[in-house]
């Protein structure tokens, strides 16, 4: 697992905090943040209409943050989600979302897997 320097980690945490507030305005209930497994981390786990949303938050100013979610990152997320569900509720309905934060604006991309 790669560790970010304090400046990058602080920026990421700030983006995640803002993302949680944005998601609440859309009717999401925050379940958990920064869930870790040996495979990786899920930034935000939220519930809406009975569906768990595993949300990757990406922020950036000088590039399009969506490109930071690679096929490799998605595979790690899926393995981490399996760990979470096996510990909590294996029968939960779920989807994987991305929340892009760029220049103070939010864009929620739901169900990003192929």
From Swiss-Prot:
Signal peptide: none annotated. Pfam families: UPF0102. Disulfide bonds: none annotated. InterPro entries: Restrct_endonuc-II-like, tRNA_endonuc-like_dom_sf, UPF0102_YraN-like. One of its GO terms (molecular function) is nucleic acid binding. Belongs to the UPF0102 family. SUPFAM superfamilies: Restriction endonuclease-like. This is UPF0102 protein HPAG1_0809.
């Amino acid at each position: 697992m790669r560790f970010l320097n304090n400046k990058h980690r602080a920026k990421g945490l700030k983006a995640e905090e803002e993302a949680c507030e944005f998601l609440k305005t859309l009717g999401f209930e925050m379940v958990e943040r920064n869930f870790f497994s040996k495979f990786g981390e899920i930034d935000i786990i939220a519930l809406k209409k009975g569906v768990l949303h595993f949300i990757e938050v990406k922020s950036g100013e000088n590039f399009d943050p969506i490109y930071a979610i690679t096929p490799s990152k998605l595979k790690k997320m899926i393995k981490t989600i399996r760990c979470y569900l096996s510990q909590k509720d294996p029968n939960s309905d779920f989807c994987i979302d991305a929340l892009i934060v760029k220049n103070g604006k939010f864009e929620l991309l739901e169900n990003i897997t192929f």
